[in-house]
Amino acid sequence: MNIRPLHDRVIVERQEVESKSAGGIVLTGSAAEKSTRGTVLAVGKGRILENGTVQPLDVKVGDSVIFAEGYGTKSEKIDGKEVLIMSENDIMAIVE
């Protein structure tokens, strides 16, 4: 299935995090944090400004990003893979 986000939306696949503590203890359940890093899979055409022009997004497909998982982030399962759909505003940084 192909999916194309609209406007300033971005589709991100969450990167797995190490589920061990610094002391080597395996963390489970609520002790294991969900990663706030991911890889951009698809981007919309851009944000529509008040004057009607489209401002392209700063992120692009393949970027590794750090994001804030907030109320606007939606989790979906596409082709058996869990992805996050979010606004570019929820992305805090691009990891280079």
From Swiss-Prot:
PROSITE patterns the record matches: CHAPERONINS_CPN10
Molecular function (Gene Ontology), one example: unfolded protein binding
Any one GO CC term of the record: cytoplasm
One BP annotation, GO: chaperone cofactor-dependent protein refolding
InterPro entries in alphabetical order: Chaperonin_GroES, Chaperonin_GroES_sf, Chaprnonin_Cpn10_CS, GroES-like_sf
Top-level taxon in the UniProt lineage: Bacteria
Keyword Membrane applies: no
Location of the protein in the cell: Cytoplasm
Family as reported in the entry's similarity comment: Belongs to the GroES chaperonin family.
Subunit comment: Heptamer of 7 subunits arranged in a ring. Interacts with the chaperonin GroEL.
HAMAP family the record matches: CH10
Function: Together with the chaperonin GroEL, plays an essential role in assisting protein folding. The GroEL-GroES system forms a nano-cage that allows encapsulation of the non-native substrate proteins and provides a physical environment optimized to promote and accelerate protein folding. GroES binds to the apical surface of the GroEL ring, thereby capping the opening of the GroEL channel.
Protein's name according to its UniProt entry: Co-chaperonin GroES
Organism of this sequence: Aliivibrio fischeri (strain ATCC 700601 / ES114)
